[in-house]
């Protein structure tokens, strides 16, 4: 299995201020391309804006604003094809946490399936949580006893707020969602089906021009480009783990023409769908 490849190992002493600090924030504004790696510690990753390809335990995720990941020390991940990507990594060492809280539930570990550790945040949740993350960013750079406790208390607040505001990437649209959140949810639900932006805006009485502009500002991509990237990431997953024909994979990912799908896939990843699948057949 290709999963035997571990990549770089990021060491605790390179990221934590002292051996007393349980929590740190690694700001990535922007997040550059970063090779396959794993850590001595766990992390909560929150994406604020821009876009990129997050390869997490060999599964591709096209990430943008609102994506949130609970990454464990045993996971391997990397960042590729980034464009104005901004995120924060909230790093924590479980055995240093001292507050009496249900940390295992609030900050799920690698014992849970990966699908249960990827969530999305809407605008309200992002705004609320970012205020706490900014405070933690300042507090975690101190090592006195009071600051250590405050840092851990801020981590607890962030974990609680994340649990309150998060929703599954494929959940139905929320009734009180902002326009941008509703659009993101609709796109995630349209990987296999056609999506008509103008009809979506008309249905919800949105201004197509302003929503299109705001989407580009926040994600760094146009609406069609983002949807195509979602579909290509799904195609990578299907090619890796399932045995459907290339034509079936294309159809499941919203491409009516399998030849066109192959061209687009090759343009995006530099390899044909069949050659990409063969990589994993060769190492099983």
UniProtKB/Swiss-Prot annotation:
Residues at the site labelled Interaction with sigma-70: 248
Any single biological process term in GO: positive regulation of DNA-templated transcription
Organism, scientific name: Pectobacterium atrosepticum (strain SCRI 1043 / ATCC BAA-672)
Function according to Swiss-Prot or TrEMBL: Activates expression of the rhaSR operon in response to L-rhamnose.
Domain HTH araC/xylS-type, residue spans: 181-279
Subunit-structure text: Binds DNA as a dimer.
Any Pfam family: HTH_18
GO molecular function: DNA-binding transcription factor activity; sequence-specific DNA binding
Cellular location(s): Cytoplasm
Protein name listed in UniProt: HTH-type transcriptional activator RhaR
Gene Ontology cellular-component annotations: cytoplasm
Chain residues forming the annotated DNA-binding region: 198-219, 246-269
Keyword NAD in annotation: no
Record key words, sorted: Activator, Cytoplasm, DNA-binding, Repeat, Rhamnose metabolism, Transcription, Transcription regulation
């Amino acid at each position: 299995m290709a999963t035997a490849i571990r990549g770089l190992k990021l060491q605790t002493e390179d990221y934590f201020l002292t051996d007393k600090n349980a929590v740190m924030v690694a700001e990535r504004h922007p997040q550059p391309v970063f090779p396959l790696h794993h850590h001595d510690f766990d992390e909560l990753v929150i994406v604020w804006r821009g876009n990129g390809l997050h390869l997490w335990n060999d599964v591709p995720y096209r990430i943008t604003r609102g994506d949130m990941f609970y990454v464990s020390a045993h996971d391997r991940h990397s960042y590729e094809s980034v464009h104005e990507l901004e995120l924060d990594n909230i790093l924590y060492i479980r055995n240093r946490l001292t507050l009496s809280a249900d940390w295992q539930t609030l900050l799920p570990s690698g014992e849970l399936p990966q699908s249960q550790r990827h969530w999305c945040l809407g605008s309200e949740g992002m705004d609320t949580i970012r205020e706490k993350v900014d405070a933690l960013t300042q507090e975690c750079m101190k090592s006195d006893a009071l600051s250590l406790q405050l840092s851990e208390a801020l981590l607890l607040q962030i974990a609680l707020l994340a649990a309150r505001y998060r929703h599954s990437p494929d959940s139905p649209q929320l009734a009180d969602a902002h326009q941008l959140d509703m659009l993101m949810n609709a796109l995630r639900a349209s990987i296999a089906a056609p999506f008509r932006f103008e009809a979506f805006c008309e249905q919800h009485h949105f201004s197509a021009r302003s929503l299109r502009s705001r989407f580009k500002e926040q994600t760094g991509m146009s609406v069609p480009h983002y949807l195509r990237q979602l579909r290509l990431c799904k195609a990578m997953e299907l090619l890796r783990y399932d045995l459907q024909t290339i034509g079936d994979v294309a159809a499941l990912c919203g491409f009516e023409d399998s030849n066109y799908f192959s061209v687009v896939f090759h343009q995006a990843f530099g390899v044909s769908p069949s050659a990409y699948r063969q990589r994993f057949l060769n190492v099983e």
